[in-house]
Design a protein with these regions (language model features):
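Alpha/beta-hydrolase active-site loop
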Residues: 42-62
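Catalytic active-site module of serine/aspartate enzymes centered on a nucleophile-bearing elbow/loop
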Residues: 208-245
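Active-site nucleophile elbow and catalytic-triad environment of alpha/beta-hydrolase enzymes
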Residues: 154-171, 176
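Short beta-strand/loop motif that positions the catalytic acidic residue
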Residues: 174, 180-182, 186
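Conserved alpha/beta-hydrolase "nucleophile elbow" surrounding the catalytic nucleophile
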Residues: 1, 70-75, 183
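Alpha/beta-hydrolase-fold enzymes
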Residues: 72-157
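Conserved alpha/beta-hydrolase
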Residues: 5-37
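Short alpha-helix in the alpha/beta-hydrolase fold that links the catalytic acid
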Residues: 190-200
């Protein structure tokens, strides 16, 4: 949540060098999709971001009609895939750090900060600024008002995003296989929440816990750091190939 596509650029370049056609993108209001003015003018929520991800998927399908379509998503990007309007075209999902963001499924040491953010800091900042200035505050990233408030509702519900009407059926009806990778040292999500999100999909194939090597922290976002190129990146490529075999 709140991570620009530029963060994933080194991994995407490496993946392309292995012969994979890759498209990365920014949701509206984020990164290269952020307008020059204030985020106050961006009327986008997470349902809007579902449509953005779907548009990216369809664009890739139009550009390369003969290739199988895979989604490699990190955190929220993986969570949204099961609800895409064009999900029937997806050949498989490789999910990194995909878990329930419900406050009760977060790491115990992280819960009090999440509670403060969801109950006080987030709503107050949005009311004052018209968007969430996360970069200024050192908390996630800058987010459109609607995205922050919808995410807040999800995180305060035991069913997380599945609390939205009809999403249970959508995710259970998604036929694509899911491979989910969870880092044992994830500082945010508990493994239980990651497994719950995994089995919420209709075709959960493989759940794997990544154990960091000595001194090589992984965490919630760290799989994509260049230090993991020799070890973890080839494993991700292997799983992508598994999804189309």
């Amino acid at each position: 949540m709140g991570v620009d596509a530029a963060y994933y650029a080194p991994f995407c370049a490496w993946l392309a060098a292995q012969g994979v056609c890759v498209l990365s993108f920014d949701y509206r209001g984020m990164g290269a999709s952020r307008p020059s003015g204030s985020l106050r003018a961006v009327h986008a929520d997470l349902d809007s971001w579902v449509l953005d991800q779907d548009a990216a998927l369809l664009h890739l399908a139009d550009r390369h009609p003969g290739l199988p379509l895979l989604v490699l998503g990190n955190s929220l990007g993986a969570q949204l895939a099961g609800g895409l309007p064009s999900r029937s075209r997806i050949r498989g999902l490789l999910a990194l750090s995909m878990g329930s963001g419900y406050i009760g499924h977060l790491q115990p040491a992280f819960r009090w900060r999440a509670w403060l953010f969801l109950r006080v800091i987030g709503p107050l900042a949005v009311a004052l600024f018209g968007y969430f200035p996360g970069k200024r505050m050192g908390v996630v990233g800058d987010l459109p008002r609607g995205a922050l408030l919808q995410w807040r509702r999800w995180c305060l519900s035991p069913e997380y995003l599945l609390s939205s009407e009809g999403r249970h059926a959508l995710y259970q009806g998604a036929g694509f296989p899911v491979i989910s990778l969870y880092a044992a040292d994830d500082e945010m999500l508990e493994e239980e929440g990651a497994r719950l999100m995994f089995v919420a999909h209709g075709n959960p194939r493989h759940f794997e816990v990544l154990t960091p090597a000595e001194g090589q922290r992984i965490g919630h976002l760290g799989v994509f750091k260049s230090r993991h190129q020799p070890t973890l990146w080839p494993r991700l490529l292997h799983h992508l190939k598994e999804l189309v075999s």
